[in-house]
């Protein structure tokens, strides 16, 4: 008798269990089982600020029942709509889940959301639009990103950036390079330190005069940028608002006030791969100035008397940054000079020092295309100095001595455009040329040329406001 009751109880329990399975997962007679016509992706990758969009097609095996949707991202319910349309502002990796139910069957689908930084490799154009600074992001070769006209206002709605002055990449203490962007804007200027992956202003430092140039200091042990004004040089420690004047080093050297040119050029030691000093130029005295990086033995002025009476057109480092090239204009005669020099090695041990010397200083002929206002940039890993005249680009190999070009290497865009800046890829094989066309409502354009063939790779015309500076970012 006991065995009979145990048998009946076992049969009943089995039947009850089967009913639960039929209703929840298996889909027996009359149960409508849920499935997806196309499986969800295992991973959805998008850029920061983009909208995650998933539109599944849901199938039911035995008639259409009313469906309920529950979309979760990062363990939070974000939608109950049939399709997920969800903007994601923060980068990172998140778990996603879709829960579907029709009252008879429940299905759960999981996926991963990978949100990448929106602003990475590419060209950044600091420009003026409606009397305010904007920062345009132009993705470069092989970068699956979108062009942004202005990444400043959208990420900093409560900041009124003034007219643009300059900008520079730098780094934060203990972190990777190029993750801090310093922008100078306004007159008098403010220095804005931005987290360059999200373009959020994290520090603001007022300067009581107009900044004409911002450059990253070359000292690897000290994260700071240099702000150049007409008569002063300041250092700004990153992740701080500490602005320190560095001017007295140079006024003491030249015996009076200085008028800084808007250039800074580092040079490296012959035997090591880091900076030995940073060079500046004083237009008031015609002096090549130096800021010590490796040690304090670096003098404040190099090759005294060489540039007396000259103003700087532009300068840059060449020969893997071991030497320097300067183009200057002698104020009294209007003659342009190309000076190729070794800036010296200043060891802390006097017997190991190597004096600076001029390799050559040659007057540039009128046929060379040089002019006051020319943009001068150097391919640092090579021996080539590029300079501009209007929309034309010229190039001089420093090893060619007095054999200056008489025709342009190439011309950019239309005759109404004027080149305002040039930037190089890390290997110097690509040169990005920024122009302004005052006849256009959006004057700023960008062109990419191959420096091996001098051919145009691509162009993006009239994409931004009046460009002030262009920077290349490698990742």
Model-predicted segments: where are they?
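Acidic, serine/threonine- and glycine-rich low-complexity intrinsically disordered segments
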Residues: 192-391
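An edge-strand/N-cap motif at the start of beta-rich repeat modules
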Residues: 112-141
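Hydrophobic/tyrosine-rich beta-strand signature of extracellular beta-sandwich/beta-rich modules
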Residues: 96-100
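Surface-exposed, flexible coil segments in extracellular/virion-facing regions
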Residues: 69-89
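A short beta-strand segment in extracellular, disulfide-stabilized domains
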Residues: 45-61
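Bacterial Sec-dependent N-terminal signal peptides
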Residues: 1-46, 103-117, 123
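Blade-level signature of beta-propeller repeat domains, shared across WD40, Kelch, NHL, RCC1
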Residues: 434-475
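Solvent-exposed loop segments of extracellular immunoglobulin-like
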Residues: 62-70
